[in-house]
Amino acid sequence: MPDQHEADGVFVKVCGITSEADALLAVGMGAAAVGFIFAPSPRQMAPAAVADIVKRLPHETVTVGVFRDESPRRVIEIANQIGLRAVQLHGVESVEDTRWIASRVNWTIKAFPAGHRNIQRFAEYGAQSLLIDGANPGSGELFDWRLAEGVVDPSRLIVSGGLRPDNVSGAIAHLHPWGVDVASGVESAPGVKDPTKLREFMAAVRTAERAANRAGRREAAPSIQPDDGRHSTTDADRRAPTSGPDLFDWQDEP
């Protein structure tokens, strides 16, 4: 997993980054992580373009590659090529696929749509973090937060799906997650981050975490160890299993 992120606040990942300027903007405003989407999407990026951005970011930035139903070997290949510090699996990946990938990277995030039955099997996937999203990733649709109550230890939970400056504090107060993930909620257009919205989002997160701290509700962060080189292409030569049943509906993504 990436270097230890100081967990005196909510972990914030700004996803759907498409430019160096937006990556630096997010980091400069306090985001701990930036996400790059490699799946078909208005925010899709080529590995070479992401590699060029990543090398210009501060060393402590957690760079996350977001994949959907990609070949496990290809996931590891891209992670190595770019030097990604985390991998997010946001598709129909099976337990076997996820475990295979997670054994080769330092931090794996497995995403599920809110309310899906496989969330109850999260421990079987071998991922360090669970991300709960709406049914249509990238659509900006908010899900019923009650569907994420008590599904996992909050110290492993990242909440996504329709978060904006005007509602992220509610998500933090309701679910007490370790982290939040935002994309369309801080954009002026798909893949174009809006400085004002991002500033307001970060301010809302910090206000909510101060309230949570006063109430004694902040969760300890998961242990994040330095990169030990486990995401190696030599390991990827081993046989990779196949994927499982459909989970997300990406048809309505803007």
Which residue stretches match the model-derived regions?
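Conserved N-terminal beta1-alpha1 strand-loop-helix module at the mouth
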Residues: M1-P254
